[in-house]
Amino acid sequence: STATKHLNEHGTLIRYPMADSIVHKVLAHNEEKLSSMVSSRKPFGLATNVAPFEEGDLTLRYNKGTGKYLRSMVNIGVELIDKWKVMISYLSAEHAGQPDKNGMFRVLSTTEILPPESICTETYLIAGAFDTEAEAINYYNYLRTRFVRFLLSLIAVSQHITRASFDFVPVQ
């Protein structure tokens, strides 16, 4: 059997007919998408090679772990500093989009909750910022569901996870 497909329908090619059907159902609800919550690159204006300070009033999450950083040195994303944040890696998981030995796809290589007074370098994105820890935990758990990982895998076709990678994922 053959099927007709409009290749420009979603802004990205969806390879699997079943996935196309699911995306149609999700988009038909016209709900807000997670892309409206995810930060752009460099959520705090800090490059990957930024190193922590000896002393500071903030905790910096960077590619080698955590360290101290001065609030006075942060000019971008200031409104996020005192919120609970869900942080994800800017790079997608390994295996070039292939399933692991258990047949599971790891789309997000790092997903962590950052407490208030924490920031990160451009190695990471802020997937969402919240007033309470409970909201951050709920969102963190949502990002780890098969539903979200599946929708992300359809559009995250490069090694980078971006705000646009969340264009199919509805806010819950």
Predicted regions and their residues:
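C-terminal substrate-recognition regions of SAM-dependent nucleic acid methyltransferases
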Residues: 1-172
